[in-house]
Amino acid sequence: MKSVTLKDVAKAAGVSYATVSRALSGSPQIGSDTRERIIKLCDEMGYTTNYVARSMVMKKTDLIGLVVPSIDNQFMSELAYYAEMSARAHGYNIMLCNSGPDLKQEKTVVKILLGRQVDGILIVPQSPKTYENIKAYTDQVPTVFVSENLRDQPQSYVAADNSRGTYIGTKYLYDLGHRDILYFGRRHSTTHQLRAEGYMKACQELGLKQRFYNSEYSRSSIAHGYEMAKELFSHPIDYTAVFASTDSNALGLLKAADEMHISIPDQLSLIGFDNISATSLPRLELTTIEQPKRNMAIQAVDMLRDKIENGTQGYVHQILLPTLIKRSTCRAL
Amino acid sequence: MKSVTLKDVAKAAGVSYATVSRALSGSPQIGSDTRERIIKLCDEMGYTTNYVARSMVMKKTDLIGLVVPSIDNQFMSELAYYAEMSARAHGYNIMLCNSGPDLKQEKTVVKILLGRQVDGILIVPQSPKTYENIKAYTDQVPTVFVSENLRDQPQSYVAADNSRGTYIGTKYLYDLGHRDILYFGRRHSTTHQLRAEGYMKACQELGLKQRFYNSEYSRSSIAHGYEMAKELFSHPIDYTAVFASTDSNALGLLKAADEMHISIPDQLSLIGFDNISATSLPRLELTTIEQPKRNMAIQAVDMLRDKIENGTQGYVHQILLPTLIKRSTCRAL
DNA sequence: TCAGGAGTCGCAAACGTTTCCACTTTTTTG
DNA sequence: CAAAAAAGTGGAAACGTTTGCGACTCCTGA
């Protein structure tokens, strides 16, 4: 269990441990013969440099804190995957924290991460209030937000262009011949407000009537989409397509439609948003708008690295374009 | 960016920094009046203890390395969720690594984790060869494996009782009246061998004929399940139920069945394994065997903590019972 | 022969903690 | 009331590394 230190290999090599350190770090001020000898010896003795000691003197941990509401969520786990890959490729490691159900938890984990001396924090906010919640810490360490739109805040973030996503989607529906399109789902939270706006903008441009259906406290879940849709379908259906603010809600609506024998897409076209993995499943095949998760993750760690390594001040808002994924829940009229 | 240290608050409080350290750590050998004064001061000055310095002297990082083939995977992200929660509740943080596509990557990240001085490692193996692959490191740090069955290896692990899972499932099918049950999918890798064994045992006890269908290099994916199933259905269907070794494969089979107008469950009952989240989706509703992921995660970190904190030697094999989730792809004959 | 420079290498400080030991002050006890 | 015990505090070492600076060796050229 006792690991071998610099001092150990120094002793074995008959040099000072400064020399060993330099040999490993590729310092130019060292003989190439001794360097090789030492490197070989390190290998034999199974020496690996102790990162916590190193961090101590370098005042840099090469650690990035990743805080997500809960990693057990398609969007976030996918994001985490690419973030970790990209970070590691650049010599960083990821410290993972679930910011749990409430803001208190979120603040706690950020505090922990600070104590751990992470070089930067990547956070996907759990609510629009997150910014205020951790404001006190974001100036102590480079931070970039992912996926929640902080528009007016002086904070770096990368996000999908939600507004453009719904715009593209309704345009697609229009081109398919639909003239009565219902927007279904959440409208509060910045993200969902933007999605609604994209729909509204498209309607305006195309001369369509804007029609919304949502309950005040709607959440993005299949169960809730189902409940909402059952309520919705109890009224006459005087629209030919619905744009769900979220894939989960769309899936819930799908379930309700099945039960009520409303055929999708024959009677009703349906389009969602997020491209969660479930949408590509057999029997589902939901047409949707994809958030470019891979790019978001990569851009986010790039931004963070820039802040860390170059000390870049200020902030940048990186907006990525979503794309339409055509599957089989929409049909031409 | 410059954070406040022990020395800073010591100066402000007019005491030595040993005293401040003691006040914070709740040492008994300190006056309760000075303790309160110091704690209040720390709060005001926004002091948080530097964990890397602390780790240095304590020779303990309170860090657990979590290595998974890829976090963007239902099973693993869910596992990671519970593991992180449980770990943090006990004062540990999680360092996340994807062990990537190959064994080389897996070895690399384990090495990194060792350099980071993690107190322990939680690893879900990417292949049966994982054990051999990282053998050299597992005796340098407490390690527990998750979900791959290392039966004969002197290594701690927690896993679902795969064999029992398939046993329960086929028994269920039998009780429903099925007498011709086909086992569909992978059979190599320890896990899947065990699953196959459970099916075989049930068949033996119940006097059923064992029937297998699989391709040599089958993987657990919907696409592959689909391909296999198309091939399968090109032969006459002289069985009334199929047990898929994996939910993903089951879903692929479902898709093929739909295309060939084979009705499930009317013509064919279907049962999967894993209870991935997709199985509970509308239109799918796959009957399956659930791995108790939450329990697995919690047990795993408990085992690891025991090794870390109590220096427990030896190894334990923790086998958890899977449960049958009845949904709508099975019907009584 | 020797000054001086290039090329190597060692010494020691520093990073921010925790904790052992010693020391001072206060309290208890005989 | 003196001595011993207890309580509270400070000094300093230690953890394993990086790196500035000084020192040493060796060689070149005058």
What is the meaning of each model-derived region?
Chain A
Residues M1-T5, D43-Y81, A89-Y92, G100-P101, ...:
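N-terminal helix-turn-helix/winged-helix DNA-binding helices
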Residues K230-L333:
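Flexible loop/turn connectors
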Residues M1-K60:
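N-terminal helix-turn-helix DNA-binding module of bacterial transcription factors
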Residues R179-D180, Q210-Y213, S263-L270:
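Short acidic capping loops at alpha-helix termini that bridge into adjacent secondary structure
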Residues P69-S77, L96-Q105, V158-I168, F184-K230, ...:
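Hinge/beta->alpha junction and helix N-cap segments in small-molecule ligand-binding domains
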